[in-house]
């Protein structure tokens, strides 16, 4: 079963997340047509190899040609047109940059897998998840309140109809009596008195009905106000907070469809109340009297209805998808000058009459006081199409939305040399995107405005890790969208908050977050051995100060390890093969009672660019004290040449003139090395190219292989039973194999990292 087919079986709230992955740069229809083929390609490799990416780009175009031919046989003109258009767009966008296409496809497939996993976890825990049950009960209660508003409006509609009928009857009888009074024959006094008494009775009924209708409208507006407060102050605020968490790697935010449904029902109800008030005015114009309840209350009812509708419509204007560069989909809110970014707006009040009637304009740093109060605060211009009309056709789910896809930022250069004397560094300087539009209807003009979460603007991709750290810190600690002076005096974070966010950084790009032991080790690095959930970590400790005795800060170390995992260790991390973050004391405690040759994998604490090493345990020949050995850590340089599973498989220790042996036997706690890593070992390569095709023997190149060898003194090895002495000829052969060229890739043991 293809991944694409599984996705199509999910509930609508997960399908909406799938919809948000695809846009014009790589349309969903290509994903649909070439589902199986796309899933069978190694896009991660293509995203890091321009030659391979170019091949895959042309393969994709060929696949589209084949699909076009199939549609031709079926005489499907529309699909032929779509295929041809998609192919043309791909050529325009990626002909010169096929790696970009591979990155987009690779990311889409990864995000799809995360959505599937989240859906599976949701389905597994839904029945027993108390929090979900509480939220479900809360939503049921709110759903009931919204339905109650709608029902009351319908009830008032019926009451106004009854009032209109009563008033028509009263008016008819009044006119009839007047006509009879002017009749030459006249009417008997007794009959006239009876009819006047009847009219008086009808007048009282009419007055009571008007009072009743006005009272019910007041009651409706009271109920609507309470319901609206729950929507705006509770549900919408919670959604925005969940969006902040999702932006920094937290659980995917629940879709807006349910919220939109509630907002729309309340808005439709208020629009209907406006029509009902107009009807009451018409009835008042036909007939009024002293102390008429309509005359007395109509202005207050109009004002309150308008105020509620205005508040609802203004609150419904939200940023559905925060600003993000397509090149870095997992790092939203960090924007680089000169690089396009996207952002999506949505109106939660989905009224048909608003389709194509709201023109949205985007502005940068509108009304931002920091432009004038913070020294050195940079200023930017927005390039690209910065106006867009909201419509229901562009969104795959039919919501009223506007998506800006081709915006860029350009810094305003001031005359003279720029000074860096401001209190904020570039990656601590927060900016804001504002969006404004105006709703115009007969007798109704409402200005709408919303803002993005704060963004960090960088000019060099090397600033991305520090910029992302600022985004993490802000959205972890702050719920308000416009506190752009935050880093003038950033608050501390509790370890309970930061530990969760750190785990999200791993779970958002892999299948595995950080466990309790790993987090404990990181907590000790930041807070010392007394680390606890309420321990406070300053911003400078997290991101700016060198950690302990190292020459780099904590966050840059974590970021480098994340990059190492994504590019070289993803499968091993997902399978749980890597212990990763573990102190030396804890490492020895785990290994000391294990059988000789047991090893574990951990990240180096001393390497700025991110590195991984392995430590194994041995025992003296008499079975006494355990001894521990750790190899010099492997960085991306070594792992780019040889995969880590192959390094583990072929690793050798050579002492004096003994035959090299692999000391690694069991992955902690007791998993056979080949069982743990066998599926990741490189497969045999194709036959080597002959050196002389026309030679008498047709001999080819002798196959070579890069292996890691640690040359150590025999005294460092406690178990030498398996290290057999070599003959001079054997030693010469091994020395030739591990020559100067290969030793570029050889790790010489220099002690623990």
Curated annotation (Swiss-Prot):
Residues modified as ADP-ribosyl glutamic acid are 657, 705
Q: Which UniProt keywords apply?
A: Acetylation, Activator, ADP-ribosylation, Coiled coil, Cytoplasm, DNA-binding, Host-virus interaction, Isopeptide bond, Methylation, Nucleus, Phosphoprotein, SH2 domain, Transcription, Transcription regulation, Ubl conjugation
Coiled coil regions in record? 136-317
Q: Which CDD domains match?
A: SH2_STAT1, STAT1_CCD, STAT1_DBD
- In the record, which positions carry Phosphoserine? 708, 727
Cross-linked residues for Glycyl lysine isopeptide (Lys-Gly) (interchain with G-Cter in SUMO1) are 703
State where it is primarily located: cytoplasm
Answer yes or no on keyword Phosphoprotein. Answer: yes
User: By its UniProt entry, which Gene3D superfamilies does this protein fall under?
Assistant: EF-hand, SH2 domain, signal transducer and activator of transcription 1, STAT transcription factor, all-alpha domain, STAT transcription factor, DNA-binding domain, STAT transcription factor, N-terminal domain
On subunit structure and binding partners, the annotation says: Homodimerizes upon IFN-gamma induced phosphorylation. Heterodimer with STAT2 upon IFN-alpha/beta induced phosphorylation. The heterodimer STAT1:STAT2 forms the interferon-stimulated gene factor 3 complex (ISGF3) with IRF9. Interacts (phosphorylated at Ser-727) with PIAS1; the interaction results in release of STAT1 from its target gene. Interacts with IFNAR1. Interacts with IFNAR2. Found in a complex with NMI and CREBBP/CBP. Interacts with NMI which is required for CREBBP/CBP recruitment to the complex. Interacts with PTK2/FAK1. Interacts with SRC. Interacts with ERBB4 (phosphorylated). (Microbial infection) Interacts with African swine fever virus (ASFV) MGF360-9L; this interaction mediates degradation of STAT1 through apoptosis.
Please state what the protein is called. Answer: Signal transducer and activator of transcription 1
């Amino acid at each position: 079963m293809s991944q694409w087919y599984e996705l199509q079986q999910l509930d609508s709230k997960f399908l909406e997340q799938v919809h948000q992955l695809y846009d014009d740069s790589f349309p969903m229809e290509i994903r649909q047509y070439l589902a199986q083929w796309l899933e069978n390609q190694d896009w991660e490799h293509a995203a890091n190899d321009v030659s391979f990416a170019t091949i895959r780009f042309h393969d994709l175009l060929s696949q589209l040609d084949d699909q076009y031919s199939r549609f031709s046989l079926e005489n499907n003109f529309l699909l032929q047109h779509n295929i041809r258009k998609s192919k043309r767009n791909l050529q325009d966008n990626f002909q010169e940059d096929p790696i970009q296409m591979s990155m987009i496809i690779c990311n889409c497939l990864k995000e799809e897998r995360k959505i599937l996993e989240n859906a599976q976890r949701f389905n597994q825990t839904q029945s027993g998840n108390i929090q979900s049950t509480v939220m479900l009960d809360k939503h049921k209660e709110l759903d009931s309140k919204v339905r109650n508003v709608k029902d009351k409006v319908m009830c008032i509609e019926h009451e106004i109809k009854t009032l209109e009928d009563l008033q028509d009857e009263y008016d008819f009888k009044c006119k009839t009596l007047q006509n009879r009074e002017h009749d030459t024959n006249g009417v008997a006094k007794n009959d006239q008195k009876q009819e006047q008494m009847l009219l008086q009775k009808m007048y009282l009924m009419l007055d009571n009905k008007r009072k009743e209708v006005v009272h019910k409208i007041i009651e409706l507006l009271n109920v609507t106000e309470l319901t609206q407060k729950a929507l705006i102050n509770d549900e919408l605020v919670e959604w925005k907070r969940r969006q902040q968490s999702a932006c920094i790697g937290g659980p995917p935010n629940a879709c807006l469809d349910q919220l939109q449904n509630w907002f729309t029902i309340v808005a439709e109800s208020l629009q209907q109340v406006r029509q009902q008030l107009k009807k009451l005015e018409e009835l008042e114009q036909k007939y009024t009297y002293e102390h008429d309840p309509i005359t007395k209350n109509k202005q207050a009812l109009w004002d309150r209805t308008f105020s509620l509708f205005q508040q609802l419509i203004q609150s419904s204007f939200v940023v559905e998808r925060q600003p993000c560069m397509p090149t870095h989909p997992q790092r939203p809110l960090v924007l680089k000058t000169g690089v396009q970014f996207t952002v999506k707006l949505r109106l939660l009040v989905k009224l048909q009459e608003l389709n194509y009637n709201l023109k949205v304009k985007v502005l940068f740093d509108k009304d931002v006081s920091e432009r004038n109060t913070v020294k050195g605060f940079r200023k930017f211009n927005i390039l690209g199409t910065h106006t867009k009309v909201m419509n229901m056709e562009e969104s795959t789910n039919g919501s009223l939305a506007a998506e800006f896809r081709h915006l860029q930022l350009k810094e305003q250069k001031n005359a003279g040399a720029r000074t860096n004397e401001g209190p904020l560094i570039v990656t601590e300087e927060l900016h804001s995107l504002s969006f404004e539009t105006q709703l115009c209807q007969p007798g109704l003009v409402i200005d709408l405005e919303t803002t993005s979460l704060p963004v960090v603007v960088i000019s060099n991709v090397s600033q991305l890790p520090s910029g992302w750290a600022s985004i993490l810190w802000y959205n972890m600690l702050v719920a308000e969208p416009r506190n752009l002076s935050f880093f003038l005096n950033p608050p501390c974070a509790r370890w309970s908050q930061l530990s969760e966010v750190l785990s999200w950084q791993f779970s958002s790009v892999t299948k595995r977050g950080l466990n309790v032991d790993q987090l404990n080790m990181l907590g000790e690095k930041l807070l010392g051995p007394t680390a606890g959930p309420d321990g406070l970590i300053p911003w400078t400790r997290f991101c700016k100060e060198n950690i302990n005795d190292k020459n780099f800060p904590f966050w840059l170390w974590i970021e480098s390890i994340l990059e190492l995992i994504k590019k070289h260790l993803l499968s091993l991390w997902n399978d749980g093969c890597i212990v990763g973050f573990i102190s030396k004391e804890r490492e020895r405690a785990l290994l000391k009672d294990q059988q000789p040759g047991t090893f574990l994998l951990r990240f180096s604490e001393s390497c700025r660019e991110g590195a991984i090493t392995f430590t194994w345990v041995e025992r003296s020949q008499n079975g006494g004290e355990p001894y521990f050995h750790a190899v010099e850590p492997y960085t991306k340089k070594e792992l780019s040449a040889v995969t880590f599973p192959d390094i583990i498989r072929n690793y050798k220790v050579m002492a004096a003139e003994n035959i090299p042996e692999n000391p690694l036997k069991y992955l902690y706690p007791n998993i056979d090395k080949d069982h743990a890593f066998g599926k990741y070992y490189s497969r045999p390569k194709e036959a080597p190219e002959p050196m002389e095709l026309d030679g008498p023997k047709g001999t080819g190149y002798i196959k070579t292989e890069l292996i890691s060898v640690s040359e150590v003194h025999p005294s460092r090895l406690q178990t030498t039973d398996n290290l057999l002495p070599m003959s001079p000829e054997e030693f010469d052969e091994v020395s030739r194999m591990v020559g100067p060229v290969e030793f570029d890739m050889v790790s010489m043991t220099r002690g623990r990292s």
